[in-house]
A protein has these predicted regions:
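Short, Lys/Arg-enriched, Trp-marked, Pro/Gly-tolerant hinge/linker segments that flank
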Residues: 115-132, 141-202, 206-213, 226-234, ...
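Short hydrophobic/aromatic patch on the recognition helix
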Residues: 70, 219-224, 269-270, 274
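Residues that scaffold the ATP/ADP-binding catalytic core of kinase and kinase-like folds
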Residues: 106-108, 235, 285
Length: 293
């Protein structure tokens, strides 16, 4: 199965999104990457595994971590990170997992903490032969059978269990859940977050949110980041990106109409925003994701 993946990838070397699977588990993207991504975050348990191509790297927090056949990159929920592509190197095929904490909770209740800071104790870890094999088999099956959703979810279950049991201190997760509750406990920040989640205008003024919280701009920024884990601007971009992904997966509206819904002044601005965060444009994202339908 692994060899089939390599042949098919080489046949469509111009693609940037090879496959995208989606469901209750979240998203799994098989990406052929040749450019960097802006600093961003996700509300998911985020795991990055190299499939083939050049070794590469991600910045997690403020530190660079390698992504190779032997090392995975592990990103906690709301942890800022970016992809750093070396233009002098060949492309890299990456299996990117964006996993919903609610789905993981079905395996162990404590795994609800997978969307919280501190779930993975370190952003990098050595890939075991089992994890490598499971990742390659999932990538191969997504390439060969893009619409086999049940098989993909089953393979993903095995992979995520292996990843979490190897890289996360799962026996301490009840404490992580209490910590997660404490970190988001300030009622002023919760109220602002609710407003932000209803906000779609790219030009939202952060001073307005500080005023709503009854805080100075500096105090608001400090309290927001200590409560949520990311600065307000990054959080707004996360919300807008998740709205965009949901629209591309679940709406039949045109990219232009979705761009207008989300408050972008030009479809080109929306496309650039989407590509800078996801690695592919919205049209390609929708086209490839429909292979899994």
């Amino acid at each position: 199965m692994v060899g089939a993946t390599g042949r098919q990838i080489r046949e469509i070397a111009m693609s940037t999104a090879l496959r995208i699977a989606h469901g209750a588990f979240g998203r799994v993207a098989l990406l052929d990457m040749d450019w960097s991504l802006v600093r961003h975050a996700h509300p998911h348990c985020h795991v990055l595994l190299k499939v083939e191509g050049a070794d590469t790297q991600f910045v997690v927090g403020d530190t660079v971590y390698p992504l190779t056949c032997d090392t995975a990159v592990l990103v906690n929920g709301w942890q800022p990170h970016s992809y750093v592509h070396d233009p002098d190197k060949p492309r890299t095929v990456i299996l990117a997992l964006y996993i919903e904490p609610e789905w993981l909770m079905a395996f162990r209740p404590g795994w609800a903490a997978s969307g919280a800071p501190g779930f993975f104790s370190h952003p990098s870890g050595d890939v075991s032969p089992r994890i490598r094999g499971l990742a390659m088999n999932l990538a191969a099956d997504m390439m060969a059978h893009p619409d086999a959703r049940n098989a993909h979810e089953s393979a993903l279950s095995d992979l995520m269990i292996a990843v979490i049991e190897r890289f996360a201190p799962w026996r301490s997760f009840p404490a992580s859940i209490r910590e997660m509750n404490a970190r988001s406990g300030d009622w002023r920040i919760r109220r602002v977050v609710a407003t932000m989640r209803a906000e779609t205008r790219p030009g939202a003024v952060l001073d307005t949110f500080a005023k709503q919280a009854g805080l100075s701009r500096a105090h608001f920024f400090r309290l927001f980041e200590s409560s949520i884990g990311v600065p307000p601007k990054v959080y707004l971009n996360v919300v807008r990106m998740e709205q965009a992904v949901d629209a591309m997966l679940n709406q039949s509206a045109s990219v232009c109409d979705i761009s207008n819904q989300l408050g972008f002044t030009e479809p080109a601005h929306f496309t650039r925003f989407f590509r800078n965060h996801a690695g592919v444009g919205p049209r390609e994202f929708r086209k490839v994701s429909r292979l899994a339908s």
